[in-house]
Amino acid sequence: MARLKDFYKDTVVKQLVEQFGYKSVMEVPRIEKITLNMGVGEAVADKKVMENAVADLEKIAGQKAVVTKAKKSIAGFKIRDGYPVGCKVTLRREHMYEFLDRLITVAIPRIRDFRGISPKSFDGRGNYNLGVREQIIFPEIEYDKIDALRGLNITITTTAKTDEEARALLSAFSFPFRN
């Protein structure tokens, strides 16, 4: 079992029940899924760019990536309906906790000029979005073998009803929030 999953069951649940006074253990917020999304607008001109982006995302997540396609045509961006414009991976259960562990302990500390992650990136429904500017913060990506620096969006979906509960949950997992 993943280290953070054990930590959640043993420590985080008790801590959140004390803090918010839940009547049942099932009321305690938990992380439902983590979605990694990489928008690759340059893929319209060059198909190789998309292949490299998918390969990078698969290395980071340890799971097969799905190519996302444009929902409608936009002339300004030279995109037609059905063109590949990005890729995504949805992590759940064990893979999710293992990725979260790597993100907190290894990847986030490798961000240049890091001063903590923004506490303002909650969506009002208990979900958190984190933008990463360079995929090289993940140890799975070898700096010499990348063709371009690409950013990605990490969405952490929780069962929390409010942002306050979600922040308490992520803080319990030792997320380095800015004060």
From Swiss-Prot:
Single annotated GO MF: structural constituent of ribosome
Protein name according to UniProt: Large ribosomal subunit protein uL5
GO CC terms: ribonucleoprotein complex; ribosome
GO process annotations (BP): translation
Keyword terms: Ribonucleoprotein, Ribosomal protein, RNA-binding, rRNA-binding, tRNA-binding
Family recorded in the similarity comment: Belongs to the universal ribosomal protein uL5 family.
Superkingdom of source: Bacteria
InterPro entries named in the record: Ribosomal_uL5, Ribosomal_uL5_bac-type, Ribosomal_uL5_C, Ribosomal_uL5_CS, Ribosomal_uL5_dom_sf, Ribosomal_uL5_N
Gene3D superfamilies given in the database record: 3.30.1440.10
Subunit structure: Part of the 50S ribosomal subunit; part of the 5S rRNA/L5/L18/L25 subcomplex. Contacts the 5S rRNA and the P site tRNA. Forms a bridge to the 30S subunit in the 70S ribosome.
UniProt keyword Isomerase, yes or no: no
A Pfam family assignment: Ribosomal_L5_C
Gene name in the database record: rplE
Taxonomic path: Bacteria, Pseudomonadati, Pseudomonadota, Betaproteobacteria, Nitrosomonadales
Role summary: This is one of the proteins that bind and probably mediate the attachment of the 5S RNA into the large ribosomal subunit, where it forms part of the central protuberance. In the 70S ribosome it contacts protein S13 of the 30S subunit (bridge B1b), connecting the 2 subunits; this bridge is implicated in subunit movement. Contacts the P site tRNA; the 5S rRNA and some of its associated proteins might help stabilize positioning of ribosome-bound tRNAs.
